[in-house]
Design a protein with these regions (language model features):
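Short active-site oxyanion
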Residues: 69-70, 122
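PLP-dependent aminotransferase class I/II
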Residues: 4-8, 13, 17-19, 26, ...
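Histidine-centered beta-alpha loop that forms part of the nucleotide-sugar donor binding/catalytic region
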Residues: 36-37, 60, 69, 85-89, ...
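Active-site phosphate-binding strand-loop segment of PLP-dependent enzymes
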Residues: 1-67, 74
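Amphipathic alpha-helical segments within well-ordered protein domains
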Residues: 68-69, 116
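Well-ordered beta-strand positions enriched in small/hydrophobic/aromatic, beta-favoring residues
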Residues: 71-73, 162
Length: 221
């Protein structure tokens, strides 16, 4: 039985949060957003991280805002927040009480200090990324067979990635383009390829094997 929806804000571009939350409300489901790419993304009502029951953010070194390593879980529910705080601190409730199995998931002082410094510059970083994204989009629009995602309306991206679609009308394949870019020092990525379900430890699992996800396989490839 389905208990929750786990949507992904991908490439710094938000999901259709209003439609997802309508589905969740109708079916009495929790919504847990994979917001690894979404720090600094805004929608019509403010930060995209305010949506859902939880938003899980990555602060890995590759992200627009980072602490080299780390992340955060955003929750509007006080009880959930306290529970997460206990989990990341060995399950401690107070100095003398442990009431659940926890982990050492606390952020180090060094990583936290780095994050505080980065916060001072995040608006400037996103503005610069937008300028680069706008330039790419204007120039790539002149090339037949290359498609950019384009505007996301009143939503505000953090421009963390610049995805393109290589169409059949382009003179070479996506993989050949990838190789040529790499030879010229441009390190593009086939981001979600291969799927996790194609990895050896999962591939033969009847519940999670790749044959159960034909649409995801088609999109990723």
């Amino acid at each position: 039985q389905t208990e929750a929806i786990l949507p992904v804000h991908v490439y710094g571009r938000p999901c259709d949060v209003d439609e997802i939350e309508k589905i969740a409300a109708k079916n009495k489901l929790k919504v847990i957003y994979d917001a690894a790419h979404a720090f600094g993304v805004n929608c019509h009502c403010g930060s995209i991280l305010n949506h859902g029951d939880l938003s899980v953010v990555s602060f890995h070194a590759t992200k627009v805002f980072n602490t080299f390593e780390g992340g955060a879980i955003i929750s509007k529910n006080r009880e959930t927040k306290l529970y997460i705080d206990q989990l990341k601190n060995f399950g401690f409730v107070d100095e003398n009480t442990v009431d659940q199995i926890g982990i050492n998931g606390k952020m180090s002082e060094f990583n936290a200090a780095l994050g505080l410094v980065q916060l001072k510059h995040i608006d400037k970083v996103i503005t610069k990324r937008k300028a680069i994204s706008d330039h790419y989009e204007s120039q790539l629009a002149k090339i037949e067979g290359i498609s950019c995602i384009g505007s996301i309306g009143e939503m505000k991206s953090n421009y963390s990635y610049f995805p393109i679609l290589v169409k059949n009308s382009f003179p070479i394949s996506r993989d050949d383009l990838y190789d040529k870019l790499k030879l010229n020092g441009i390190h593009a990525r086939k981001y979600f390829y291969p799927l996790i379900t194609n990895f050896p430890m999962i591939h033969d699992n009847r519940a999670f094997g790749s044959e159960r996800f034909p649409i995801a396989n088609r999109v990723s490839s």
